[in-house]
Amino acid sequence: MKSSNKLMALGIVFSIAVLIVIGTIVYSIINDKKDKGNEMFAYSTQQSLGKDDAPVKVVEFGDFKCPACRTWDVTVLPRLKEEYIDKGKVQLYFINFPFIGKDSDLGAAAGEAIYKQDQDSFWIFYDEIYQSQKKDTEEWITEELLLNIVKEKLPKIDVEQFKKDLHSKEIKEKVRKDSDRAQKLKVQGAPSVYVNGNLANPDFDSLKKAIDKELKK
């Protein structure tokens, strides 16, 4: 009887030890993914939508002048938000890739200046500037347009602070770092979308397949 109790106790200890080892391995894998993501995309410095502990990180490289990015915002993002982001499965990050025209940089700077004050306001701006989009051959992103968006749609943003930040060295440096990151990753166009560090086709069906694959790991 005593021998049986000892064997049972040893079995329990062994089971606990195995669980600890498995837990350590899983924790290590998750942290490795986070470290890889932080190295590639600098998650902590980027605009994000969704829970920080979401298991899948989706990164969009975009240009507010890009017609395909506007289409992505209108057709793909709402479904991504409904099926994954709002359920805590995906956290979305936006990284500037201003490549179409001179005013692409101004749009990127505006987004960063708004994000500096309030992250939720950035995502309102994200939708509003895409709704204001004109032909990509026109320089339609102007300070007048940006100020109108801030004044009319973003009550949490201090307008005077926004004006100061828009052309500040700090904001220009942030946009430059985003551009450098895109260059290092050899981003070819926008929107370019990554799922847990892997480049994916930006259409919803392809993203769903890539996300579901990551969720099963």
Curated annotation (Swiss-Prot):
GO terms for molecular function: oxidoreductase activity. The gene is bdbD. Belongs to the thioredoxin family. DsbA subfamily. InterPro entries: Thioredoxin-like_fold, Thioredoxin-like_sf. It comes from the Bacteria. May be required for disulfide bond formation in some proteins. The keyword ATP-binding does not apply. This is Probable disulfide bond formation protein D. It holds the Pfam family Thioredoxin_4. Keywords: Disulfide bond, Oxidoreductase, Redox-active center, Signal. Disulfide bonds join C66-C69. Residues 1-28 form the signal peptide.
